[in-house]
Swiss-Prot record:
Transmembrane segments: none annotated. Gene3D superfamilies: 3.40.1360.10, Winged helix-like DNA-binding domain superfamily/Winged helix DNA-binding domain. Its cofactor is Mg(2+). This is Probable meiosis-specific protein SPO11 homolog. It is found in: Nucleus. Required for meiotic recombination. Mediates DNA cleavage that forms the double-strand breaks (DSB) that initiate meiotic recombination. Residues 1-92 form the Topo IIA-type catalytic domain. Its EC number is 5.6.2.2. It catalyses: ATP-dependent breakage, passage and rejoining of double-stranded DNA. It comes from the Eukaryota.
Amino acid sequence: MKNNLKVKLEELVIYILKNIKRYPNIIQRLKFYEQIHLGLTLNKIKNKREIYYNSVSIFKKQSIVDMLIKDTCNKLKCTQSDLLISTTLKGVFYGNITFYKNNKLVHVNLKGTSLIPDMNQIDRIEYTQKKCLIIEKDTIFSKTVREYISNDILFICGKGYPCRNTLLLVNKLNIRKYGIFDFDPYGLEICTKYPSIKKIGIDIKDINLIDKQHFMILNKYDIRKINTLLKQKVYEIELFYMLKNNIKIEIEGLFSAKGFDINNYFYTKII
């Protein structure tokens, strides 16, 4: 497969050089093809960011690399992983979990927070947890894994909008999934990106626990996003509440509330 792709890539380069006037970004293309060809030759996997940072002065922007990846996959009729380009890793997890590829151990995490490995290289995972808690924000994730006492929960953080790699891991988990997100339209939209998840916070009942100094008013972008989500008919109760009260709240407001007990909060929410 790799040798076949190398041949196709070489043929593509020849074609582009013969039709150079049709490709104004020829320098960027040739540099990109060079990196891909080298990766296929050495059987070395790279992610999008590595490709970009190897030639920042040529590519100028990450979006150029993203466009070239998509264009090359279309032209060669292959996938990103066929080109040995891995997904840029962003999400993290906390908990005992083992990852396998072709029955060979690829990654194991026994203690501490770890970056989710490239799930395109994983075909089997093993875990003992019965539940999964997905946390929107990295700061809240760090506080939760430090202070929340539980051995049967796997913690995952997508650091905002989850990347495809994070979603691939979540999809492989055959356990109950819960999530906590900001009480704003973007937090709710992020929640919709996760399949089969039960949102446990911030919910409207939690607002009574939060000091009003943490209440923020909606801006025009929030209102625009709310209207977009309402058209999708998701979380309508929360969205109408935000509009009616002109309010949004970050998770930090809940966690800093007077008398807030993180163990009691999650114990009553995660069942």
